[in-house]
Amino acid sequence: MQELIACVDHIRFDLELAVEQQLGAQPLPFPGMDKSGAAVCEFFLKSACGKGGMCPFRHISGEKTVVCKHWLRGLCKKGDQCEFLHEYDMTKMPECYFYSKFGECSNKECPFLHIDPESKIKDCPWYDRGFCKHGPLCRHRHTRRVICVNYLVGFCIEGPNCKFMHPRFELPMGTTEQPPLPQQTQTQQKQNNNQVLQRSSSLIQLTSQNSPVSQQRSPQTIGVMQSQSGNQGNRGPRPLDQVTCYKCGEKGHYANRCTKGHLAFLSGQ
């Protein structure tokens, strides 16, 4: 009723023009400031903003569907360059880690989204086509539907709005792209283990063939090692005549037995 009696759609105030044209907007003192509470730059959406990083308004690029979790804690350093949304929107919050990991969240006022795990499971394209070899072990959802009789005959007037199932006979993916059965994976693992055992046995045979040469050379090497170990074992402490104290510079005692102090080397200069 108010629009019929006193319609003001044809009236344009000077304030509206100033806001649209950003009249009086001062540039930022330095780039990189927090502009989370500022409005969206209308010129940037039209690719006509010449202020760049000094613009006091937010520069939003693309469609941002998820709120930045670092911005929620005040730790996001990307500013306008962030690929996530810097805006508190409950419908675009990121997914709750605890609910997705453990199936429950103890926080009653959790701001993050609690998505049902069942809704994440996709329909099995092979089962929708008619048959899935994985059966109940398939990781995709097997939904039983009633086939539309009219579609099987040749034509259904309901089209995509039909409440019955319209089967699709083309292959959803390559025949080799479907994940293998658990039995097939077990057999492949056994084959790989057998190959490893065969390789190890062949290496053992090669080493056994070369063993006589090593046995012929082993006594000489053993004698050398024994002589070296014997020389090291007979080595005892050096006589005191060959020991030089690094504190006083005299021979005949170790530094830990020196009685002249740590400045004794200055007396000899």
Swiss-Prot record:
Entry annotated with the keyword Zinc: yes
Broad class of where this protein is predominantly found: nucleus
UniProt GO cellular component terms: mRNA cleavage and polyadenylation specificity factor complex
Record key words, sorted: Metal-binding, mRNA processing, Nucleus, Repeat, RNA-binding, Zinc, Zinc-finger
One Pfam family here: zf-CCHC
Record's keyword annotation contains Zinc: yes
Stretches with biased composition (Polar residues): 196-234
GO terms assigned for molecular function: RNA binding; zinc ion binding
Domain of life where this protein originates: Eukaryota
Region Disordered: start-end pairs: 173-239
Biological process (GO), any one: mRNA processing
Zinc finger (C3H1-type) boundaries: 35-61, 62-89, 90-117, 118-145, 146-169
Location within or outside the cell: Nucleus
Biased composition (Low complexity): 175-195
InterPro entries named among the record's database cross-references: CPSF4/Yth1 (IPR045348), Znf-CCCH_3 (IPR041686), Znf_CCCH (IPR000571), Znf_CCCH_sf (IPR036855), Znf_CCHC (IPR001878), Znf_CCHC_sf (IPR036875)
Zinc finger (CCHC-type) residue numbers: 243-260
Entry similarity comment: Belongs to the CPSF4/YTH1 family.
Primary role: Component of the cleavage and polyadenylation specificity factor (CPSF) complex that play a key role in pre-mRNA 3'-end formation, recognizing the AAUAAA signal sequence and interacting with poly(A) polymerase and other factors to bring about cleavage and poly(A) addition. Cpsf4 binds RNA polymers with a preference for poly(U).
Quaternary structure (record): Component of the cleavage and polyadenylation specificity factor (CPSF) complex, composed of cpsf1, cpsf2, cpsf3, cpsf4 and fip1l1.
Protein name: Cleavage and polyadenylation specificity factor subunit 4
Organism ancestry: Eukaryota, Metazoa, Chordata, Craniata, Vertebrata
Gene: cpsf4
